[in-house]
């Protein structure tokens, strides 16, 4: 190749590199905004104790039904709080006179009032119930969502409170979407106590990047390079590496003595069936069960299948 050819290649490389840099200059502010909108509590009112999506009829119905469940049980409620990682975290404990407790971990944007809706099947299955404002939600402290990684320490601290203060011999986790990620990291932690027994998961994703991609696709947003720029923002602000710290990888470390019930919907467009099956297959717990529901979108399985959803939980434990 002659000098002219070499010069042309160099010029082309410079133009391509320059174009890529120009693109990043344009897309970086977009990625920062997406990150702040979706995963950062930018004001005290954000992710407060309100219905996160009142325009969605099913979401509002779940909210109303949860409040209807909690109201007549107010006499069984104890307001509780813990401190972990320097954050004050709050919850409500409902004592039904049993020796085991279910901690309900809601998805992103949701507070403990949302979790009331999932408490009913546990009351019926002879559990006490703890609902919590996860960090940076409701009345709990915090700004950044760490995708379940540091929240897992919060879960372990809640479990310790349930065991030591309230005498629960067993503590179980019910996780919805990202709440399951916190549960998986807690159960696979070297600090997991013997009384933390297992998990019921609804709609858990294989990785945050995978489900975030599907949310962006549903919103008809361009993926490249914004998707991975958002993942970089997560790492920059929280230290979480979503490429390595993800449920599909962590669940392979699930202790053999844990029990896990997977609840998934065939209509879920964010935790799609093919990926959900992979998560179940990867789980190293000896006692695991997978149940599919034909109807119901992401995090909306119970409202579309109340009888069979509640029965699945009851039969898993009884």
Regions found by a protein language model. Give the residues of each.
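An N-terminal hydrophobic leader/cap segment in hydrolases
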Residues: 12-82
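The serine-hydrolase catalytic nucleophile loop
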Residues: 108-121, 134, 274
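Conserved alpha/beta-hydrolase
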Residues: 119-141
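Hydrolase active-site cap/lid region
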Residues: 185-242
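Conserved alpha/beta-hydrolase "acid-adjacent" motif
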Residues: 243, 269-275
């Amino acid at each position: 190749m002659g000098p002219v050819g070499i010069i042309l290649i160099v010029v082309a490389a410079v133009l391509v590199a320059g174009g890529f840099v120009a693109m990043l200059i344009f897309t970086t502010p977009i990625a920062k905004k997406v990150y702040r909108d979706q995963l950062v509590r930018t004001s005290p009112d954000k992710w407060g104790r309100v219905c996160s999506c009142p325009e969605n009829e099913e979401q509002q119905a779940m909210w109303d039904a949860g409040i209807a469940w909690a109201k007549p049980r107010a006499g069984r409620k104890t307001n509780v709080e813990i401190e972990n990682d320097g954050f004050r975290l709050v919850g409500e404990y409902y004592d039904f006179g049993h020796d085991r407790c279910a901690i309900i971990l809601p998805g992103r944007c949701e507070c403990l009032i949302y979790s009331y809706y999932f408490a009913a099947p546990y009351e019926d299955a002879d559990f006490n119930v703890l609902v919590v404002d996860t960090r940076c939600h409701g009345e709990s402290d915090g700004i950044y969502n760490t995708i379940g990684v540091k929240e897992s320490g919060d879960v372990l601290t809640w479990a310790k409170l349930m065991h030591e203060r309230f005498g629960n011999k067993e503590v179980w986790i019910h996780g919805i979407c990202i709440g399951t990620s916190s549960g998986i990291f807690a159960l696979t932690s070297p600090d997991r106590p013997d009384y933390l027994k297992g998990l019921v998961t609804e709609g858990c994703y294989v990785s945050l990047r995978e489900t975030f991609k599907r949310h962006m696709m549903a919103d008809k947003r361009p993926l490249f390079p914004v998707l991975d720029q958002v993942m970089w923002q997560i790492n920059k602000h929280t230290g979480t590496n979503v490429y390595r710290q993800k449920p599909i990888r962590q669940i392979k470390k699930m202790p053999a003595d844990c029990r896990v019930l997977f609840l998934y919907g065939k209509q879920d467009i964010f935790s799609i069936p093919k990926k959900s099956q992979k998560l179940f297959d990867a789980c190293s717990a000896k006692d695991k069960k997978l149940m599919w529901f034909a109807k119901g979108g992401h995090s909306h399985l119970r409202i579309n299948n109340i009888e069979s959803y509640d029965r699945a939980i009851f039969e898993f434990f009884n």
